[in-house]
Structure formats: structure tokens, C-alpha cells
């Protein structure tokens, strides 16, 4: 079989579990050398590396907080060290809703945290990758359905940050297009991941499922 991504190098932020894991494994299965970043869960990262090995892929895992410029620099340096000085694919999965708060319950730290984890991480990684991304390269950012519809109860800052990601992606598509770099955003709705196991209620998930054409939640593999 022809591997679509033979000889390509891919970085996946938040690449150790759920959506990130499915994407990391899929990229590796298609022949890319994968450098996956994880925040703090070493066990998840090791498990993902094992899954990649199972599909005959090649990967490394690098710990780091993608809201910090130094950690982002380190991620790309480690990737270069392992796989050479170019990156063909960047998938920014890092982000999350973290919790639900009404506007009067949100303090400045909450605002900063949600904007940092969802938007600053994308900004820092994109800025870092551009000088080392050849023509034909691709940047994929994870926005959210919340960016389009304002999000559910208490998700205003998450929705706002993801809206910023969507607009930033459009700006980058214009700016980087002439260099032959594609930039796209994916806006998933409810995907069955541990994210929803933690931050959603079974009743709400059932109600949302009923509103979808397929009457069910999506899966991480479908997104990948």
C-alpha cells in the first residue's frame, strides 16, 4: 500500500489521549514520523507510543505546557533532533473547556487561562513551525462548534477562545497560502471523549445526541 505521508514529519499537540491520540496513530499509520506533545500524563503518552508501534509507525513523545514559549521551542527542537529540521504537518489539539462558569463567576485568571490554553498555544506553535514548514505543509487547528454557536451553558470563554482560533486560522490561510502552506480549522460538536465524561452531564449528552442527524455522538477516530 502507498503511504500517503511517507517521509513527512508531524507534530501533534495534546497528542496523547482522545482526539490527539487518534490523530497521532492515524498520521503514523499513514507513514508520518510523529512527535506528540503531552502536558503531564506520561502513562497516556506511553500508551499512545505503543499503539503507534503496533501500526508500524515511528514516534516520540515530548512533555510540555504549550502555553509557554520555552516549552513550545523545546518541543520543536526535540522533533528536529529526532526527525530532521522540517515539520510538514502541525495539528494543534491542545485546548479545552476546563469548567463551566457564568459571566459573573469568571475572574481574570479564568479568562487568561481559557484564552491561553485554547488560543495562545495555537499562536505559539504556529509561529514556531512556519520557518521550518516546507511548501505543501499543513496546519490543522482544533476550534469547536461552540465557536460558531456561542457554546453551551457556562462555556462563554471557551467559545470565545475557540472563535479566536477560527479567525486566526483564516488569517493564517491567507498569509501562508502563497508559501504553499494550508491552514484549516476543524469544529467538532460532541465527540465521545473523557473531556465530556468530565465536563458534561449524561442528560445533556442525550439531549445533544437527539439534535444530531446521526442521533449519536461522534468518535475520536471519525475526527482523525
Report each predicted region and the residues it spans.
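Catalytic Tyr-X3-Lys loop
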Residues: 88, 104-123, 140, 165, ...
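Alpha-helical segment proximal to the catalytic Tyr-Lys
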Residues: 131, 174-178
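Conserved mid-core segment of classical short-chain dehydrogenase/reductases
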Residues: 73, 96-112, 131, 153-157, ...
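Active-site helix of classical SDR
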Residues: 126, 161, 169
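Conserved glycine-rich cofactor-binding loop
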Residues: 9, 16-17
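Residue(s) in the substrate-gating loop at a strand-loop-helix junction
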Residues: 144
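A conserved structural motif in NAD(P)-dependent oxidoreductases
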Residues: 212-223
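Conserved glycine-rich Rossmann-like NAD(P)H-binding loop of the short-chain dehydrogenase/reductase
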Residues: 30-47
Amino acid at each position: 500500500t502507498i503511504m500517503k505521508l511517507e517521509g513527512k514529519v508531524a507534530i501533534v499537540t495534546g497528542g496523547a489521549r482522545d482526539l490527539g491520540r487518534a490523530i497521532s496513530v492515524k498520521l503514523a499509520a499513514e507513514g508520518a514520523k510523529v512527535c506528540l506533545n503531552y502536558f503531564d500524563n506520561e502513562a497516556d503518552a506511553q500508551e499512545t507510543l505503543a499503539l503507534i508501534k503496533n501500526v508500524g509507525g515511528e514516534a516520540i513523545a515530548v512533555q510540555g505546557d504549550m502555553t509557554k514559549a520555552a516549552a513550545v521551542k523545546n518541543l520543536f527542537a526535540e522533533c528536529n533532533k529526532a526527525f530532521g529540521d522540517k515539520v510538514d504537518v502541525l495539528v494543534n489539539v491542545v485546548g479545552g473547556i476546563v469548567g463551566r462558569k457564568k459571566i459573573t463567576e469568571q475572574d481574570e485568571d479564568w479568562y487568561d487561562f481559557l484564552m491561553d490554553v485554547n488560543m495562545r498555544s495555537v499562536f505559539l506553535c504556529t509561529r514556531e513551525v512556519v520557518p521550518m514548514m516546507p511548501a505543501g505543509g499543513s496546519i490543522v487547528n482544533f476550534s469547536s462548534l461552540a465557536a460558531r454557536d456561542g457554546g453551551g451553558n457556562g462555556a462563554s470563554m471557551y467559545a470565545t477562545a475557540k472563535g479566536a482560533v477560527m479567525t486566526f486560522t483564516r488569517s493564517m490561510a491567507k498569509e501562508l497560502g502563497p508559501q504553499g502552506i494550508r491552514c484549516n480549522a476543524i469544529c467538532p460538536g460532541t465527540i465521545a471523549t473523557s473531556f465530556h465524561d468530565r465536563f458534561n452531564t449524561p442528560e445533556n449528552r442525550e439531549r445533544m445526541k437527539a439534535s444530531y442527524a446521526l442521533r449519536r455522538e461522534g468518535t475520536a477516530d471519525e475526527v482523525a
